Amino acid sequence: MNFLAAAGVRRLCAMRAVLPCLWRGKYFSSGNEPAENNTVTPMLRHLIYKIKSTGPITVAEYMKEVLTNPAKGYYMNRDMLGEEGDFITSPEISQMFGELLGIWFISEWIAAGKNAAFQLVELGPGKGTLLGDILRVFSQLGSLLKNCDISLHLVEVSQKLSEIQALTLTEEKVPLERNAESPVYMKGVTKSGIPVSWYRDLQDVPKEYSFYLAHEFFDVLPVHKFQKTPHGWREVLVDIDPQVSDKLRFVLAPCATPAGAFIQNDETRDHVEVCPEAGVVIQELSQRISLTGGAALIADYGHDGTKTDTFRGFCGYRLHDVLTAPGTADLTADVDFSYLRRMSQGKVASLGPVEQQTFLRNMGIDVRLKILLDKTDDPSLRQQLLQGYNMLMNPMKMGERFNFLALVPHQRLHGRNHQTNARQSKPSPSPVAGFGELAWQ
């Protein structure tokens, strides 16, 4: 991604076309926010200084600064998940979500021949709740995994979140090892005795047989936004409003910009979002899986190359204008799963995307719900289970808005096993769990 950052967009002193509110629709206000909402945050001051120095910035650079700037970034020094945060994720809603994902990884491990060891790698683990639910399944199915050497590897840029993850997973029963200068900046041991390590970059995770999990990871990676004009594709930039010195606005670049190379030649939409960083991550995952085996499971808000503008902000569970009070709200964009598949470049087989309600139903969520309901007579617990199920499965909630995509070695789909440390070559599940009913040949 450095080549894009280096290329940048030089200061645009002329031909700045103000971008109309093309995407504001149901997501945003008209742009004429009341003065009291135009909070001059430390991040806004930083961005204004930056734009004055170098000119308008891309939406991708804007997202990156707002979310992950080491000093002022939204993710860097706060807990944005759960009741006190700005959004709740699936693992916070119901234990069934993580339990079924745990079953998925075990299913794929068995299908590949029960390798003697595997790494479970999560990208952006949130509070660690999802991993905690997965590890509980691993413990419950300990007879299957008792001779398998498992280790956890967490890719997390936020120091605040990594501390929360450590508390969730280890309860600090064993003191954590910390080394801020090392690629492995923290190490520990989970409550069940599994070693866990933290990294800032996926490339630092050992290239071994691994299962990868990316739940609501890709939707916060920076996107470049483009508008089709009579002169071709023009990138949407963020600039200072000339009428209000402490307010930002969207403008169109007067000429082509480097990120335009990521737009497909046959693109028919008038507005597109592209995420080169997502492509880099998918290429890395695909390369690793093709060389060392394993699989990747991706779950996120998304579409299959059909949507146009999805860039939006969240603050206190409410939609928030993306240019207002930067640094106080989460910024996100739906994942283009067609782009992710394309960027795997044929190195692995891809399955999906399938809607969350389909994936979870195929994984047996209805059976799991019945088991949990049968185990309790507590009305409040039963209501909590039913509400969680509804949130996960209802098409108007998460059921159709979230999608699942899997990356597996090509040989996985042909029932062949090429893992040197595998204990067996059969049975081979068909089809891959979640993308068809969980069944065995």
Curated annotation (Swiss-Prot):
Pfam family, one: Methyltransf_28
A biological-process GO annotation: peptidyl-arginine methylation, to symmetrical-dimethyl arginine
Reactions that this protein is recorded to catalyse: L-arginyl-[protein] + 2 S-adenosyl-L-methionine = N(omega),N(omega)'-dimethyl-L-arginyl-[protein] + 2 S-adenosyl-L-homocysteine + 2 H(+)
InterPro entries for this protein: NDUFAF7, NDUFAF7_sf, SAM-dependent_MTases_sf
Composition skew (Polar residues), residue ranges: 418-427
KW Mitochondrion (keyword) present: yes
EC number: 2.1.1.320
GO annotation, cellular component aspect: mitochondrion
Localization in the cell: Mitochondrion
Residue stretch of the organelle transit peptide: 1-46
Entry keyword set: Methyltransferase, Mitochondrion, Transferase, Transit peptide
One Gene Ontology molecular-function label: protein-arginine omega-N symmetric methyltransferase activity
Chain positions covered by the region annotation Disordered: 415-434
Main location: mitochondrion
Functional note: Arginine methyltransferase involved in the assembly or stability of mitochondrial NADH:ubiquinone oxidoreductase complex (complex I). Acts by mediating symmetric dimethylation of 'Arg-118' of NDUFS2 after it assembles into the complex I, stabilizing the early intermediate complex.
Subunit record text: Interacts with NDUFS2.
Family listed: Belongs to the NDUFAF7 family.
Protein known as: Protein arginine methyltransferase NDUFAF7, mitochondrial
Gene source species: Bos taurus
Lineage, broadest ranks: Eukaryota, Metazoa, Chordata, Craniata, Vertebrata
